[in-house]
UniProtKB/Swiss-Prot annotation:
Residues 130-141 have a biased composition (Pro residues). Residues 8-67, 252-262 have a biased composition (Basic and acidic residues). GO terms for biological process: mRNA cis splicing, via spliceosome. This is Uncharacterized protein C30D11.14c. Pfam families: KH-I_KHDC4-BBP (PF22675), KH_12 (PF23469). The lineage of its organism: Eukaryota, Fungi, Dikarya, Ascomycota, Taphrinomycotina. Residues 1-150, 252-284, 383-434 are annotated as: Disordered. It comes from Schizosaccharomyces pombe (strain 972 / ATCC 24843). Residues 102-113, 393-408 have a biased composition (Polar residues). Residues 263-272 have a biased composition (Low complexity).
Amino acid sequence: MSDSRQNSQREDNYSRDRRSRFTEDSYSRRDSQRSGNEAPRESRYYRKEEHLQERSRSRSPARDSRWKSSSSGFAPAHPPIEEPTNNGAEAAAAAARRIAESLQSTKATSSRTSYDHSEGITSTTSASPPSAPAPPLPPSSEGPAVDIPPSMADITSKVIEGDGVFMQDVEINNVRNRYILVRASTLSEIENKSGVQLFSKGRYYPNKALATDKDPPLYLHIVSHNRKDLTVALQEIESWINKDMGPLIDERRFRRREDNERNNSNSPRNFSTHGNGNGENGQPRRKWLEEKVYINLTPSRGFHLRQAIVGPQGAYVKHIQQETRTRVQIKGQGSAFIEPSTNRESDEPIHLCIMSHDPNAIQRAKVLCEDLIASVHQQYKAWKSQPKDRDQNQGNRAYNPPNRNQAFSARDSRQEKTQPTNASPAPLVTPSLPVPSIPAVPGMEAMAMPPGVTSSIAVPTTSSMPLQGMPTMFGAPGVSAPGTEAPGTGTPGLTTPGVDPYAAYGGYNAYVQYYQQQIYAQMHGVSGDQSHPQ
């Protein structure tokens, strides 16, 4: 009985040693309760100090002790925090030092990726260690940059052979003459000389690190049936890579023109001060010179001032531009020119704007514009001196309404000239002589004119009748009386207003009878022995 109790007590002591502080307290309280003598509870401050001592004994030393004891042998994981200094220059220098150290560490741990065309895998190579010297700086802009073409060993991949076909890739992404190598004409020339097949693949990347497996950098894919042709193709490609093609940009645009007139001190400045005063390639940028020639006329109703200045379809302005090599535009109020900046006409009076780089050309154009404006002033004065037709004038051209009397007289004269050619004109009787009475139709009494009536009636005779063709049925040819001629026949201008046109014939009925006699006589003269018409 006593042995079993001793064994259990021994186990309790062993387990108590392996338990933590918290379980030890709980067991001590439990034992004290069993014995009936309860120990007093410890304060929070005492337990906190005991906990710190427990951590310092069982684990690493406290954080503060790392820096206080130099003999402990622990190296600091982080550098101590520098105390702020009152000197701004020292603080800036320290910040710059820290930035430089971080950049050096970043460069040391960086890696670059290169694409292998033959294997199609991505390989990563670590950069140089921090102790390696920094790469050389790029050449300064003062000296000309020299493009050294890469060697063929650096840009060609391994030869892939299979089924009697040899394939190889040549990377030209960073080659200066890549734009010439990818041309169809260049590829055809290399194919004809070497007997291989060339294909341009990939895409151009200014930064080759952005290339992917799907879109590799720009390269040439060579397919050949023997190694000899493949070697010839590589030699041709190398010759194109090393060929000096001259400047890729036309440098003549950036060269300053040697013009003595421009360097003249009396000539105005023709260089703009855009930005730093220089254009591309450090050369001054040229500026358009302007000259305004005012017209000094106000647009008036009925006088087209703009049309008079520019001419039909701008012919006057175009002539000045061709003669002087300048640009001439009409601007201002009433010019219909919309300013791009304000989207409306300018507030200035109407004028001609001359623009050019050459001041002498502007002066020549100014003289021609002044002559044109002087001519327009004369046209305006001539238009203003005609107050009756002012509202109907168009510039210097007046609109004259048609004269009806002249129009009808001209029409009568034109139609008189176009009478039938087969009708011969009959002689006219003197107006002072009385008209003789002749029997026009056999068996019919002759019609006598009233006494005292004279007329310029042409009496046709049988000898004057036409032998061929029938005349018009609306009047005898050559017969004219005041107011009796049909439109287009007779002598114009003999109609007297207010007078009966049939008074000379004794009335309208007598005229109709006379007309029928004339028609019958003409028909009888043509037909010969024709019977009387029914």
